[in-house]
Amino acid sequence: MTTVLDASAGQGALPFVAPASRWSDEAARGLSAPDLLLYRSNLLGSDLTVTNFGGGNTSAKLAGRDPLTGQEAPVLWVKGSGGDLGSMKLDGFSTLYLDKLLGLEGLYGGVAQEDAMVGYLPHCTFGLNPSAASIDTPLHAYLPFAHVDHVHPDALIALAASSGGEAAARAIYGDQMGWLPWKRPGFDLGLRLRDHVAAHPGLRGVVLAGHGVICWGDDAKACYENTIDLIARAAAYLNARLAQAPAFGGETVAPLAPTDRAQAAAALMPRLRALMIGDRRKVGHFSDDAKTLEFVGGRDFARLAAIGTSCPDHFLRTKIAPMALDPGRLNDDAYLTEAIAGYREGYAAYYERNAGPGDPAMRDANPVVVLVPGIGRFTFAADKTTARLAGEFYANAINVMRGATALGDYLGLADSEAFAIEYWALEEAKLQRMPRPKPLAGRVALVTGAAGGIGAAVAARLLSEGACVMLTDRDAETLEDARRNLTGLFGADPVRASLCDVTDEAQVKAAFAATAREFGGLDILVANAGLASSAPIEETTLELWRKNYDVLVEGYFLASREAFPLMGRQGDGAIVFIGSKNALAATPNASAYASAKAASLHLARCLALEGAAKGIRVNVVNPDAVIRGSKIWDGDWRRDRAGAYGIDPGEELEAFYRNRSLLRRDVLPEDVAEAVLFLVSDAASKSTGNVINVDAGNAQAFTR
C-alpha cells in the first residue's frame, strides 16, 4: 500500500548536478581543427548534465580548400542530422560552404517556406559530404562566431520553460545572456538569433525559450568552457532556490520499499503491455530513481504531468504528456483498460484538433510514459533502447519541471506548436527513413540453460533478429560469460541475465518476474536447461533417476507454468522445448535420460492442447549429438556414451555420430538455433504440437 503524507513534511528538493570542465590540454594537443571540434562535441555529449542523448549540435567555421578552384573557402562544420554528440565520429559532421549558406537568406520568404529551405541545404554541401545537414544548421551559420554550441541542459531548459525564467536569467548572467521567445528551429530562428546578438553586444549565449541554449567562443576550448560555465551557474542558482522548499508542492505519497516497487513493476508491466494494442509489439523499461519518485509523490504531480513536456527533444521521445495511474487501483483490470483507452481517445482528440489536410496519418496513440505514485516510471517503445531513452528523456522533463517551478509557473508548449513539431513533415521523413524492424523486434524471450552451447546459440540467434533475451542458467560464472559475450555483440539493452536452477521453484519464479520487470512481459520461452546421464538400469540410482526428471521434466514444467499466464494475458506466445533424439528413439544405458526426454516431449504436446485457446504455441526441437560447445558433452556423458558404443571418446566419437546420421553431417548449436527461430517466428504462426528433428537424419527418430 502507498502511504499518503502531509505535503508540508520534508526538506528541500533534490538538487541539480552542475557540470565541471573535463577539457584536457594534453588530450587536445596536436589535434587538427576538425578533430578539436569532435573532441569538444564528444565531451559535451557524454555529459548528461549538458545535453540529452542525440540532442544538441556543435559547429566550427573552418577554412577549406575548394576542390574545383583550389581557392580557400570558409566552411561550416556542423553536427549532421541524427546521431549523438557523445559518440559521433568525424563523418557525423555536415560540411557546407558558408557563403552559400548565408546567401540562402535571399531565397527565404518567411516561415511558410521553412520546409522548402531544408531542400536547399544539400546544394551548399562542401566536398560531396553525404552527411545530411540538420534543421538547426541556420542557427550556427548566421551567428558570427567561429565556434558555436547548441545544447539542451536541464538547468537552462528549466529557465526556458518557466514564467520566471527570463528574470532568473538576468539575475544569473546580467547582460551576458540573451533571451528569445519560442520559435521552431529553422531559418526564421537563425535570422532572429543573428539580429538579437547584433543588437546586444557582449552576450555569451542566448536562452531559446522552451528549447535550450546556444553559446559560443573564439576557439574550441573557450567555447566548451563557456558552455559548461553557463550551465553550472544556472544549476547553482536553481539549487539555492530548491533548497528553500520541497519540490512539487511537497511529498504526499511516499515511495514503497525497493523490493515492493520491483514486485509491483513485475506485476503491472505485462498487464499494461497486453493492453497497448497496435501494429507493433512493445518492450518496457522501469525506473524508480529518486527524482522520479520525488515527482510522482508530489502534491502537484498530476497537474504538472498533464501540462506536458516543453522541450521538443523530450516530447518527440515521450509524447507530449504521460499517463498517470492511481496506485491503489493497479490490480483492477477494468481500471487499467479504461485508463489506456482514455489515453488513446485523448491522443486521437489532440490529433483531430490540430491535424491539417497534408499532415501525416495519426501514429500509435498508446502512452509512451506511465507514471505511478510510490512506484516509479514505466516507458514502452518498439525496442528496449528506445524505451530506455524515452524514460531518460522524461527524467530530463522532470528535472525541468522541478527547476521551472522553483522560479515560477512551469510552461508547456501550446497544443498546436507541439503537434507541429511531432507531425512536422521533416520529422515524418526521418521516421520513414528508419530501417524496417527485424522479424522479432518488440518480442521478449527467456532461454533456460543459456550458458551452454545450444542455449547461447539460440539466444544469439533471437537477438540477431531483434528480440530481447533473458538468459538463465544455474552456473553463475558461465552465465556471466554468456551475458558478457552477447552484450559485446548486441549491446547491453536487449540482454539480461538471471541466475536460475530450473529445479528451484522460487528461482524460476524470480527469473520470470525479472523478465517482466526488465522487458515488460514475455513472448518466447525456450526451455533448454539440461543434463545427461548414462548408466545401465541396474546401476541407475534413484538419485540419478530423480535428477534427470527434476531437470528435464519438472524444470520444463515450472518454466512453462510461469510463461503461460504472461503469454495468455496478451493472447500470444511461443514455447519451444529442446528435446533429444532419445525422446523418440530408445538408446542403451540411458533409461533415465531418454525416458525423461520422452516425458518432456509429451508434456509439450499436452501444453500445445492447453495453450491453443490462449494463442500459445508449443513445439519441440529434437537435436542429436550436438557436441561442440556443449557442457554436457564435456563431462562424463561423453566418456559414458563412448563406452556404450565401445569407441574412443575423442575424435572417434564425433566421427561415429557424424557417420551414423543419414546425411553424414555434424550437428552444430547454430543448426538447432535456426529451428528454434523458425518455430518462434511468424513463419510458424500456424504450427503447434509439432516436432522438428535436427539430427542430420536418424531413421529411429522419424516421427510416426
Name the predicted role of every residue range.
Residues 526, 612, 617, 687-689:
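Short, small/polar-rich loop/turn modules that mediate ligand/substrate recognition or access, typified
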Residues 536-537, 541-549, 657:
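Substrate-binding pocket helix/loop in short-chain dehydrogenase/reductase
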Residues 538, 585-591, 613, 664, ...:
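Active-site loop immediately N-terminal to the catalytic Tyr-X3-Lys motif
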Residues 560, 596, 604:
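Active-site helix of classical SDR
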Residues 565, 609-610, 685:
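Alpha-helical segment proximal to the catalytic Tyr-Lys
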Residues 580:
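Residue(s) in the substrate-gating loop at a strand-loop-helix junction
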Residues 688-704:
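Short C-terminal tail/terminal secondary-structure segment
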